[in-house]
Amino acid sequence: MELAVMSPVLNGMGTLEAALEYLHSLGVKSMELGAGGYPGKALMDPKEFLGKPEKIEALKALLAKYEMNICAIACHGNPVHPNKELAKDFHDQFVDAMKLAVELGVDTIIGFSGCPGDCEDSKNPNWVTCPWPSEFSEILEWQWNEVVIPYWKETVKIAEEIGIKKIALEMHPGFCVYNPASLLRLREAVGPMIGANFDPSHLFWQGMDPCEAIKVLAGAIYHFHAKDTKIDAANTAKNGVLDTKHYRNILDRSWVFRTVGYGHGKDVWNNIISTLKTVGYDGAISIEHEDDLMSSKEGVEKAVAFLKEVIIYEKAGEMWWA
């Protein structure tokens, strides 16, 4: 396993080199590079590099200068948005990000499954969370069979032509893929290029046990986000977990995102890392900071210190005791 940081956390540093220098000073040797979509292009805009071999070589030299590996390219978006212009923009950015990944020797691209509307004439996405009244079940089947599955079948073909090996979709509420069952549904329909970007922060508040979810997804986990969630037991007892209050309304929300260790303790994270290792995942553990109680810098540094104690870096030796 390797410790990584998702670059949008460091967008405020202004330049990619400043972010690389900072991570190098922390002993971090891997970066998840944001290059479009919701992560933005503050530190990396693929269009500035694609078709320009000299700029690609300069970028590789910059990464080598700070001993930095790019573990994946992040370009989360909603490529099946009912607004066709938005959908095309998200799709085009995703394709550019895939092309950049291959130029840099990176085989994994990260995104969202997306969420369509409820019909061809919709203006906004419609995330279905219940089967009744029956219209919701009908909407869900239309979304999957007419939009999501066809879109990803075509996008996988494009990815294969470009040279991408893995599409790691983040299981995120608000999108059609939001838990292991929906991730596996898409994977079974489209093929093994589709896998999970496993972010336990989105599973904690839905009531899932990340370790059990990891077991269900064994062999289909292509990336991992290290982000925590703090559940407010009192607010959850009163209002449940479907909470639309702003994330800054910490006192009244049922849950909020936290830096690793501030939602769940070391034992929980030890078990998550151990379960990942058990199912054969040996890739990046990428820090994502969305904690409104501390700065990005403090959050990253606390997460780095915490995870250095938790991550299993080496392969297990011979079982000499058995």
Predicted regions and their residues:
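Acidic/histidine-rich catalytic cores of soluble enzymes
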Residues: 2-5, 13, 30-31, 73, ...
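A short, acidic, flexible beta-alpha connecting loop/helix-capping segment that sits on the rim
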Residues: 10-11, 286-295
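Short, acidic/polar
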Residues: 12-23, 88-98, 206-214, 269-272
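Catalytic domains of carbohydrate-active enzymes, especially glycoside hydrolases
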Residues: 18-38
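Active-site acidic/histidine proton-transfer and metal-coordination neighborhood
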Residues: 21, 58-66, 79-195, 270
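A structural motif
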Residues: 28, 101, 106, 164, ...
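Glycine-rich, proline-tolerant flexible connector loops at the mouths of alpha/beta enzymes
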Residues: 33-58, 114-120
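C-terminal helical cap(s) of enzyme catalytic domains, especially alpha/beta-barrels
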Residues: 296-316
